[in-house]
C-alpha cells in the first residue's frame, strides 16, 4: 500500500521514461533488443577471454572485467525498466530502490576506475614496452582491479548510507526510470545537506582522480607516438589506443551530458539523456572492442569455426 500524507514512504513509484502509453510497447521492444545485444556481446567477450589463452594478457584482463561490470551494471535496472513498460503501476519498495541504487553506483564507479586502469596499461605498453611484462604483472593487474572495485564499494556505501538516513514523507513519485541520487533527494522531507556534501566529495574524487590519471597517461602516450619515426609504427600505436579512447569518450561524455542536464533543472531531459549513459554505452563497449581489435576478431572467428564443425559432425 502506498504511503499517505504525514506517513513514511515504504514504496516508490517510478515515473518511467515516458508518460505516453502509445510509446510504451515500442520502447519495450527497443530496450529489450538493446538488453539482449548487451548480454550477448558482454557474455561473448567474457567467454572468449576465458577460453583463449593468447588473450590472457593485462589488456584483455581489464577488458574481461569491463565486460563483467557492463553485464552486471545493465542487469541492475534494465529488467525492472522493461517490466515498467508493460505494467500499470511501476511500484518499487524502499529496500528494493536502495538496493538497486547501491549496485548501480557500485558498478558505475568501478567502471570509471577500470577504464582508468586500462589507460595506465596503454601508457606502459606504449611508453615503456620493454618493461611492460614486469610493470603490468599479474599481481599489479589484480591490485588495480581490486582497487577499482574497492572505490566502487566505498562510493556506493557512502551514497546509499547517506540516503538511508533521509526521511521520505508524502512524496513518493521518482521522476526517473531508475533509483538515482538526484531524483531521490528531491523527494526527501528532511535536510539533504549531508547528502549534498557527500555527493560533492565522492563525485569530485571519482571525476578528478580518473580524469587526471587518464589525461596524464594520454599526454605521455601521444608524446611517445609522435616520437615514433615510422608511419607504420605510429599507426599501430594509435590503433592500440583507439578503442579505449572511444570507450572513454562515450562513458565520460554521456555521463557529463546527463548531469549537465540535471544541474540545469531539466529532469525530463536528464532522464532521457541518461538512457545513452545507462543503456547504450554497455551495449556499444563489446562492439567497439571486438570490431576494432584484431586479436578478438581472430578468437571470435576460431570460435565460430569450432561451432560450425561441431554442428557438421
Curated annotation (Swiss-Prot):
The UniProt record lists the keyword Zinc: no
Ranges in the topological domain labelled Cytoplasmic: 47-54, 121-139, 218-237, 292-313
InterPro entries listed in its UniProt record: GPCR_Rhodpsn (IPR000276), GPCR_Rhodpsn_7TM (IPR017452), Olfact_rcpt (IPR000725)
CDD domains on file: 7tmA_OR8B-like
Disulfide feature: 97-189
Localisation per UniProt entry: Cell membrane
Top-level lineage group: Eukaryota
Transmembrane segments: 26-46, 55-75, 100-120, 140-160, 198-217, 238-258, 271-291
Keywords annotated in UniProt: Cell membrane, Disulfide bond, G-protein coupled receptor, Glycoprotein, Membrane, Olfaction, Receptor, Sensory transduction, Transducer, Transmembrane, Transmembrane helix
Membrane topology of this protein: Multi-pass membrane protein
GO terms of molecular function: G protein-coupled receptor activity; odorant binding; olfactory receptor activity
Biological process annotations from GO: G protein-coupled receptor signaling pathway; sensory perception of smell
Glycosylation sites: 5
Pfam families reported for this sequence: 7tm_4
Extracellular compartment spans: 1-25, 76-99, 161-197, 259-270
Main localisation: membrane
One term under GO cellular component: plasma membrane
Function: Odorant receptor.
Entry similarity comment: Belongs to the G-protein coupled receptor 1 family.
Stated name of the protein: Olfactory receptor 8B2
Organism: Homo sapiens (Human)
Amino acid at each position: 500500500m502506498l504511503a499517505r500524507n504525514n506517513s513514511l514512504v515504504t514504496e516508490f513509484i517510478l515515473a518511467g521514461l515516458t508518460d505516453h502509453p502509445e510509446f510504451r510497447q515500442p520502447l519495450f521492444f527497443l530496450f529489450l533488443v538493446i538488453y539482449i545485444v548487451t548480454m550477448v556481446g558482454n557474455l561473448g567477450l567474457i567467454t572468449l577471454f576465458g577460453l583463449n589463452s593468447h588473450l590472457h594478457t593485462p589488456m584483455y584482463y581489464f577488458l574481461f572485467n569491463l565486460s563483467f561490470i557492463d553485464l552486471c551494471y545493465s542487469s541492475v535496472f534494465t529488467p525492472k525498466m522493461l517490466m515498467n513498460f508493460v505494467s500499470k503501476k511501476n511500484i518499487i519498495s524502499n529496500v528494493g530502490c536502495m538496493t538497486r541504487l547501491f549496485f548501480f553506483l557500485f558498478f558505475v564507479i568501478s567502471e570509471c576506475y577500470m577504464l582508468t586502469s586500462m589507460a595506465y596499461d596503454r601508457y606502459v605498453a606504449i611508453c615503456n614496452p620493454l618493461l611492460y611484462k614486469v610493470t603490468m604483472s599479474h599481481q599489479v593487474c589484480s591490485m588495480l582491479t581490486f582497487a577499482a572495485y574497492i572505490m566502487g564499494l566505498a562510493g556506493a556505501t557512502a551514497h546509499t548510507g547517506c540516503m538511508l538516513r533521509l526521511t521520505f514523507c508524502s512524496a513518493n513519485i521518482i521522476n526517473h526510470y531508475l533509483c538515482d541520487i538526484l531524483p531521490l533527494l528531491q523527494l526527501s522531507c528532511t535536510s539533504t545537506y549531508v547528502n549534498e556534501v557527500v555527493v560533492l566529495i565522492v563525485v569530485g574524487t571519482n571525476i578528478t582522480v580518473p580524469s587526471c590519471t587518464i589525461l596524464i597517461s594520454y599526454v605521455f602516450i601521444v608524446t611517445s607516438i609522435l616520437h615514433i619515426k615510422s608511419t607504420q609504427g605510429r599507426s599501430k600505436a594509435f590503433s592500440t589506443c583507439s578503442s579505449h579512447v572511444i570507450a572513454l569518450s562515450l562513458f565520460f561524455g554521456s555521463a557529463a551530458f546527463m548531469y549537465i542536464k540535471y544541474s540545469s533543472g531539466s529532469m525530463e531531459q536528464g532522464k532521457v539523456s541518461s538512457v545513452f549513459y545507462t543503456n547504450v554505452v554497455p551495449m556499444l563497449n563489446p562492439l567497439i572492442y571486438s570490431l576494432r581489435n584484431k586479436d578478438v576478431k581472430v578468437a571470435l572467428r576460431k570460435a565460430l569455426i569450432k561451432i560450425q564443425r561441431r554442428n557438421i559432425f
